[in-house]
């Protein structure tokens, strides 16, 4: 992903 958080970083 892009920008979402630390835990959801990469899952968009």
Curated annotation (Swiss-Prot):
Mediates visceral muscle contractile activity (myotropic activity). This is Periviscerokinin-1. It comes from the Eukaryota. Keywords: Amidation, Neuropeptide, Secreted. Belongs to the periviscerokinin family. One of its GO terms (cellular component) is extracellular region. It is found in: Secreted. GO terms for biological process: neuropeptide signaling pathway. Expressed in abdominal perisympathetic organs and abdominal ganglia. The modification Threonine amide is found at residue 12.
């Amino acid at each position: 992903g892009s920008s979402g958080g630390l835990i959801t970083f990469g899952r968009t």
